[in-house]
Amino acid sequence: MSSRDSAASEITPEVLLRAYACGIFPMAESADDPGLFWVEPEQRGIFPLEALRISSRLARTVRSDRYRITIDTAFERVLGECAAPAPGREDTWINNRIRKLYSGLFEIGHCHSIEAWDGDDLAGGLYGVSLGGAFFGESMFHRSRDTSKVALVHLAARLIIGGFTLLDTQFVTDHLRSLGATEVPRRKYRALLDRALQLPGDFFALPADRPVSGADVLAIVRGTTAT
């Protein structure tokens, strides 16, 4: 379900958080369209944190620490990269109003980015909204192979350690499905969301000021001990 709403012109970061708590989120038709509309999918995409699919190749890449992972150090750049055209994605739903709103959420501590660096180059990353024990993944990008996937694995580990129970992807693409994303009906999603919102999720329970090795991240996600 989606609806255009004249009240969209009155959206603030605080209103946006209340909307997320109700299971709805805003989108734009395109990056050039100044309007916004509310969306509440009949089938909601989620990532079961205990069922993230990590291929052998991806596991090797994560374990190698080839890409340096940082948290919240380049939020605006990640947002800009997610909004930019890319091969197979000539247009996006991230317009200037979306960028301003989520930058506002970042300023008050409810939006976060995970960056994957190849040397000094920002090679991939993702951003999303944190509320209670729920994390709403908004968008990701990659400039090098598997960098967005590596960022996702690091995100999953951070959410598990932080006591989160819901990783919302909003919609499921073939790419996300290959990583373990699935769809649930709106009623089940709301129940999952309501439970998650009661939890005091801590996005920084896993330290952000020092590196976490890929081996440790894989151990967290797989529920094992790093070797």
Swiss-Prot record:
| SUPFAM superfamilies with a match to the protein in the record | Acyl-CoA N-acyltransferases (Nat)
List the InterPro entries hit by this protein, alphabetically. Acyl_CoA_acyltransferase, Leu/Phe-tRNA_Trfase, Leu/Phe-tRNA_Trfase_C
The yes or no answer to whether the keyword Transferase is present is: yes
- Give the Enzyme Commission number: 2.3.2.6
Q: Which UniProt keywords apply?
A: Acyltransferase, Cytoplasm, Transferase
Gene3D superfamilies in UniProt: Leucyl/phenylalanyl-tRNA-protein transferase, C-terminal domain
Which superkingdom, per the lineage? Bacteria
Top enzyme class, one word, equals transferase
Annotated catalysed reactions: N-terminal L-lysyl-[protein] + L-leucyl-tRNA(Leu) = N-terminal L-leucyl-L-lysyl-[protein] + tRNA(Leu) + H(+); N-terminal L-arginyl-[protein] + L-leucyl-tRNA(Leu) = N-terminal L-leucyl-L-arginyl-[protein] + tRNA(Leu) + H(+); L-phenylalanyl-tRNA(Phe) + an N-terminal L-alpha-aminoacyl-[protein] = an N-terminal L-phenylalanyl-L-alpha-aminoacyl-[protein] + tRNA(Phe)
Q: Which GO terms describe its molecular function?
A: leucyl-tRNA--protein transferase activity
Any GO BP: protein catabolic process
**Looking at the Swiss-Prot or TrEMBL record, what is one Pfam family this protein matches?**
Leu_Phe_trans
UniProt-annotated location(s)? Cytoplasm
Recorded GO CC terms: cytoplasm
User: Where does it primarily localize?
Assistant: cytoplasm
Q: Which family does it belong to?
A: Belongs to the L/F-transferase family.
NCBIfam families to which the protein is assigned, alphabetical: aat
Say what the protein does. Functions in the N-end rule pathway of protein degradation where it conjugates Leu, Phe and, less efficiently, Met from aminoacyl-tRNAs to the N-termini of proteins containing an N-terminal arginine or lysine.
This one is known as: Leucyl/phenylalanyl-tRNA--protein transferase
